[in-house]
C-alpha cells in the first residue's frame, strides 16, 4: 500500500529506509503531499511525531529537483540556537548524502564560517529571527537570498506571541521583495492556542495556509 514516502525521490526513500523510517507518522502522511505540491502549511503535532522529518523529507525532494545554481534556497528559522544545533546534527548526514549543503547562522557563528557561507552558500540555512533580520541588508548575502524558495518557522507559537514575531513578519516581507516572488511557507508547533491566528501570522496578508 502506497503512503506519503512513496511520493519522495527514490534516493531519499532509500536513505530514510536505511535510517529506520519505514512508515510515515500521521502528521507526515498529511503534510508531505501538501508540501510537495507547493502549499503553505501549519503543522501542529505533539513532540515525537516527526514534524521535523515531515518538512525536511519533502524539502530534500524539492531541492533535488531544483535546476537553479548556487544560492540559499531554503531558510529554516527557530527561536533558539540550541534548536538550530540539534536540527543540524539530526539532518546534516541525510542532506550531505544527497549532495545538499546545510549551514547554521546565528550570533555564535565564527567569522570563518560566515566567510565560507559567502563563498559557498548553503542550500539550506538554519537561523534565528534576529540573524535573518541582520543578514538581509548585507549586499553579498542578499544575492544568495534572492534564490529562496522555502521558509520554515519552527516553534512558531513561541515566535508569533512575542516581539520577535513582528521582527520575523517584517523580515519575511522584505524577503518577498528581495526574491521578487512568493516562496513556500511552513510552520511547525507542538501546541497552538488559535490555529487561525498562527496561520495568518505565517502566511501574512492574502496567502492561504493549510492547517
Give residue spans per PLM region.
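Interdomain "pre-motor" coupling segment immediately N-terminal to P-loop NTPase/helicase cores
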Residues: 1-3
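Conserved P-loop/Walker A NTP-binding site and adjacent catalytic elements of P-loop NTPases
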Residues: 6-7, 13-211
